Amino acid sequence: MSLAGCSFTEEKGDYMPCLKLKRGKTVNIEFSSGSHAGQTAEEAGQMMKDQKRCVDAWVNEEGRCVLKFNQDQLKAEYDKTVGDIKTAIKQADKPVEVNYDCNEITYYVDNSTELMDFSYTHVVLVGECKLIQAYAGIPYDERELTIKFIYQPTGEVMFELHITNDNSDASLTKEEFEKKLEEMKQGEQAGIRVRHISRMP
């Protein structure tokens, strides 16, 4: 990834900004093979090119799609991605947060939460956060994500998953989630009982 003609901006938005390209300059950005929604890297690149969302597109030796953006195209893709993240958070069934660097997604769980409450949101946010990292100039090999599930009544971390390029499907089963949630509920009940007893005269 060549960042000649780019600069890292200090603008403070909701998420880290995309690379600032000088007018007339372009940047090549490599994308993970999982970011094409059922398309091959070649098909995804061709579609972006046909829609004039990039200057050029090709598949590199590793089989990943590389897109060449100019200043306006990069900003447009970045703005679209930020919009998609905000929409996904707004439409989520339960509270969700994405940090400024887009490398940490936090899901807040209460006693009525089911894992499927987050399933659609999760698919969207993981993909979009990786895109923001790409547009911000983070090299392909350094894009990572931490996924946290926090039990809201106590603030305890239930699960912490790490998604890297080598481990792109850090997953959690329904059974694992339900078992841990039950443990959390029992722990909370025990805590309430202890607090109640300690308040007795």
Question: What do the PLM-derived regions correspond to, one by one?
Answer:
Residues S2-G5:
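C-terminal motif of bacterial Sec signal peptides marking the signal peptidase cleavage site
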Residues T9-P201:
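Mature, Sec-exported extracytoplasmic domains of Gram-positive
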